[in-house]
């Protein structure tokens, strides 16, 4: 498993990182009501001041299961899952780029994990994230 704190230090050590992150705090949702990304969402706004306070980061935790062989229903199905974390403080067009993605782990094939298995896979990841809950100082570029 990739260590989140080391990935975060590397992620934040880019020459334009502060300018890119500042863009999210300057973002104003459009008056049209059309949502283009998470920053336009009423649900995001309902999370309170933590997500809108400068230098606080918001991450998206994502698991995507896929068939290793194909997506055809008639063929053999072997399910595997990628566990990823994205920084939502980046402009939308950069959030999901591979270089900005923390690859947290993978669920083992051939079946989707049970509740017990997924808990065992996610617990170490959550423990790494808990370290940052009350804030940590990480130097940028």
Question: Can you annotate each of these PLM segments?
Answer:
Residues 1-141:
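Domain-level cores of phosphate- or acyl-group-handling catalytic modules
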């Amino acid at each position: 498993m990739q260590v989140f704190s080391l990935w975060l230090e590397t992620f934040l050590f880019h020459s334009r990182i502060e300018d890119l992150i500042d863009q999210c705090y300057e973002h104003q949702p459009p008056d049209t009501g059309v949502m283009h990304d998470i920053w336009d969402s009423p649900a995001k706004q309902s999370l309170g001041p933590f997500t809108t306070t400068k230098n606080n980061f918001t991450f998206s935790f994502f698991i995507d299961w896929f068939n290793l062989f194909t997506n055809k229903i008639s063929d053999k199905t072997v399910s595997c899952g990628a566990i990823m974390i994205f920084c939502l403080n980046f402009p939308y067009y950069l959030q999901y780029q591979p270089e900005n993605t923390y690859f947290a782990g993978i669920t083992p094939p051939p079946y989707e994990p049970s509740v017990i298995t997924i808990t065992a896979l996610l617990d170490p990841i959550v423990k790494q994230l808990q370290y940052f809950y009350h804030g940590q100082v990480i130097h940028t570029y």
